[in-house]
Regions:
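Short juxta-domain linker segments that transition from a proline/glycine-rich
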Residues: 1-179
Length: 179
């Protein structure tokens, strides 16, 4: 059903239509992860259809960037608009970041995985075009903040298949998932 109500043309890609922050770099998605992704893809399509029917503006407010841009300049530009101000309480800081993102039409959702689920998701977050970020609820707010900012990078680049661009050069950073 969602295929027929989606107003966008089908995207031709060898990979999935989204980019994930997984537990391990270049890992295969588990069945649980695929279920969560499918659920949020359907929610994203439904939201897109409803926003068109309700004349709700979902235009992107932030600029598009590429991997050739100077990362420091990009960070400085976007910090002015997206940085809510630091708060020592990480939960409050995460909430203020999400609120600031919503002011710029970036939707942030969170999924909670129960301890007794048979097929667990092996992703910490993912980005869906045009403006949806999905995070896995973590015990550590620091890790959720890291994943949120990571996915913001994909939003700013507007590139979902970035794995193909960066390749295996970043396998040395596999330990980052321990944060």
């Amino acid at each position: 059903l969602s295929y027929y109500i989606d107003p966008k043309d089908p995207k031709e890609s060898k990979e999935e239509s989204i980019f994930f922050r997984k537990d391990k770099f270049n890992a295969e998605l588990s069945f649980g992860a695929k279920q969560i992704v499918t659920h949020f893809e359907e929610e994203n399509i439904a939201f897109s259809a409803l926003s068109k029917l309700a004349d709700f503006e979902t235009e992107r407010k932030l600029s598009f960037y590429s991997t050739t841009n100077d990362p420091q300049k990009v960070a400085q530009e976007n910090r002015k608009t997206l940085y809510p101000g630091f708060n020592k309480d990480r939960r409050t800081y995460l909430k203020s970041l999400i609120n600031k993102f919503s002011e710029h039409k970036i939707l942030v959702f969170e999924f909670i995985e129960t301890w007794n689920k048979k097929e667990k998701a092996n992703i910490n977050g993912f980005y869906l075009t045009p403006s949806t970020i999905v995070l896995k609820r973590q015990k550590s707010y620091r890790r959720e903040i890291f994943t949120l900012i990571h996915e913001l990078g994909h939003y700013l680049l507007n590139i979902e298949e970035i794995d193909e661009i960066i390749g295996d050069d970043y396998t040395t950073y596999e330990g980052l998932d321990k944060i």
